[in-house]
């Protein structure tokens, strides 16, 4: 009889200790901060250099649309650089398949990228372009990335470009075909 009360007492103490501690609510609650985002894994994971020129619109696009996080969630290796010196150093390493940059920086980056060992494709990023900028960009590039609320838009352009590159055909965004 004493043993029965002892085990009952120990059980009550154990439940009381576990029920009032930090672990009391584990797994039974969550906080919904925003809408969930589903990102499919890329069929063509790639190494992407993102040139976040402080004087361009890319930092604003990153803030609003989380470009780097979207790419990483899809299985890409995204690296952010903020200066031209960092871009040159990164391109010299020869590790990148794609360079994502503001539409204004793209022409100069194409020249640098073509001299790189890996010859990455430069994808121009358009964020809140003027009609003139949009028209000029459409003439210069076969494709471009426009941030949208749908992460699949960015990922579709990246995957299509990588598909062409991996198949040995001209990448979809190369200006010289």
Where are these regions (language model features)?
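Conserved acidic segment of CheY-like receiver
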Residues: 47-58
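Short beta-strand elements of ligand-binding domains
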Residues: 101-102, 120-129
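The C-terminal output helix
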Residues: 160-174
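Short N-terminal or domain-adjacent regulatory/targeting segments
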Residues: 21-46
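Conserved phosphotransfer microenvironments
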Residues: 98-118
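Bacterial N-terminal signal peptides
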Residues: 8-17
């Amino acid at each position: 009889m004493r043993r029965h009360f002892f085990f009952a007492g120990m059980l009550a103490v154990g439940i009381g200790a576990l029920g009032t501690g930090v672990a009391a609510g584990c797994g039974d609650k969550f906080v919904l901060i925003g809408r969930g985002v589903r990102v499919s894994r890329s069929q063509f994971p790639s190494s992407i250099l993102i040139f976040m020129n402080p004087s361009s619109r890319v930092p604003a696009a990153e803030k609003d649309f989380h470009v780097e996080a979207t790419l990483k969630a899809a299985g890409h290796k995204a690296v952010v650089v903020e200066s031209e010196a960092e871009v040159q150093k990164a391109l010299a390493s020869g590790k990148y398949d794609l360079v994502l940059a503001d539409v204004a920086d793209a022409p100069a980056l194409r020249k640098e990228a073509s001299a790189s060992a890996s010859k990455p494709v430069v994808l121009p990023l358009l964020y809140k372009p003027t009609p003139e900028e949009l028209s000029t960009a459409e003439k210069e590039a076969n494709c471009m990335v426009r941030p949208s609320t749908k992460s699949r838009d960015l990922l579709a352009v990246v995957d299509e470009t990588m598909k062409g590159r991996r198949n040995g055909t001209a990448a979809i965004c190369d200006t010289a075909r």
